[in-house]
């Protein structure tokens, strides 16, 4: 059925029950050509994203998708960079005002949930353009009952969002999600060590993209139970995680997964 007349306004449903403007916003995320994978483990939360320099004249160290919102919360933007940077600045302002008012850092759940609600409300307002980006918030939160630090991941997309154990967003996200779902069935992510979780996330990236990764081509951010601050992982440590994945046994495993699911590129 033709989309004529049903994709002019964000508030109009198509006969199939779709909001085409929301679908277009998700496509804008994939057109950026980057894939992001975030994963929780036993004592940490990690986010991995491709690092690509769009112009050879740009300085590579100035191009990033990872940002600190406050000391304890990080965010990865996937999609249209200008939209993402504007949202990051708003999130930083909210976190700063919260700390000034209450004297304590804003928790990742307190920050992300209102943003998810706001994204959903924007789908009901014809006068506002949806953001062509997905924000992946990561951080550690302390359990009120036993004081244990629990890793958290919240995705904020053009339709709303959710709290997740792991996620993949952007280019070829369907393949990466299929890989993560298979691994989750074999070994729940909350039982894994940091190294095991990191290797699964990197293998998901390689499986979806169909190519080997280099440490310089991946940005990694992390929060741990020992250090609650959101920090970047060095290329040296990323290289240690990538080395076992270059072995024939690992390559055969993720190629097998890729062909088993028969997924279609978004």
Swiss-Prot record:
Q: Which CDD domains match?
A: proteasome_alpha_type_6
User: How would you summarize the oligomeric state and partners of this protein?
Assistant: The 26S proteasome consists of a 20S proteasome core and two 19S regulatory subunits. The 20S proteasome core is composed of 28 subunits that are arranged in four stacked rings, resulting in a barrel-shaped structure. The two end rings are each formed by seven alpha subunits, and the two central rings are each formed by seven beta subunits. The catalytic chamber with the active sites is on the inside of the barrel.
Annotated organism of origin: Trypanosoma brucei brucei
- One GO cellular component term, please give it: cytoplasm
- For this UniProt record, give its keywords in alphabetical order, as a comma-separated list: Cytoplasm, Nucleus, Proteasome
**Per its UniProt record, what Gene3D superfamilies does this chain match?**
Glutamine Phosphoribosylpyrophosphate, subunit 1, domain 1
- On the tree of life, the source organism's domain of life is Eukaryota
* Coiled-coil portions: none
Query: Predominant location of this chain?
Result: cytoplasm
Q: Which Cys-Cys disulfides exist here?
A: none
| Biological-process GO terms, alphabetical | ubiquitin-dependent protein catabolic process
Task: Supply the name of the protein.
Answer: Proteasome subunit alpha type-1
| Pfam families (UniProt xref) | Proteasome (PF00227), Proteasome_A_N (PF10584)
Query: Where does it localize?
Result: Cytoplasm; Nucleus
Q: What does this protein do?
A: The proteasome is a multicatalytic proteinase complex which is characterized by its ability to cleave peptides with Arg, Phe, Tyr, Leu, and Glu adjacent to the leaving group at neutral or slightly basic pH. The proteasome has an ATP-dependent proteolytic activity.
Q: What is the lineage of its organism?
A: Eukaryota, Discoba, Euglenozoa, Kinetoplastea, Metakinetoplastina
Which family does the record assign?
Belongs to the peptidase T1A family.
């Amino acid at each position: 059925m033709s989309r004529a007349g049903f994709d002019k306004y964000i508030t109009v449903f198509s006969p199939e029950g779709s909001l085409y403007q929301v679908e277009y916003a998700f496509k804008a995320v994939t057109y950026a050509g980057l894939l992001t994978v975030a994963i929780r483990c036993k004592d940490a939360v990690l986010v991995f994203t491709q690092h690509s320099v769009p112009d050879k004249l740009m300085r590579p160290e100035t191009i990033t998708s990872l940002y600190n919102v406050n000391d304890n919360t990080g965010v990865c933007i996937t999609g249209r960079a200008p939209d993402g940077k504007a949202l990051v600045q708003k999130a930083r302002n909210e976190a700063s005002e919260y700390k000034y008012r209450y004297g304590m850092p804003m928790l990742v759940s307190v920050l992300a949930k209102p943003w998810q609600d706001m994204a959903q409300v924007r789908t009901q307002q014809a006068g506002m353009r949806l953001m062509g980006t997905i924000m992946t918030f990561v951080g550690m939160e302390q359990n009120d009952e036993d004081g244990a630090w629990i890793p958290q991941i919240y995705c904020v997309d053009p339709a709303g969002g959710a709290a997740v154990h792991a996620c993949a967003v952007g280019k070829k996200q369907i393949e990466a999600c299929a890989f993560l779902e298979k691994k989750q069935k074999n070994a729940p992510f909350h039982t894994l060590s940091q190294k095991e979780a990191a290797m699964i996330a990197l293998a998901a990236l390689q499986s979806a993209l169909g190519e080997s990764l280099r440490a310089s081509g991946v940005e990694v951010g992390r929060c741990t139970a020992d250090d609650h601050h959101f920090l970047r992982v060095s290329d040296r440590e990323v290289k240690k995680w990538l080395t076992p994945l270059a072995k024939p046994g690992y390559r055969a495993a993720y190629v097998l997964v890729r062909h088993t699911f028969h997924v279609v590129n978004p």
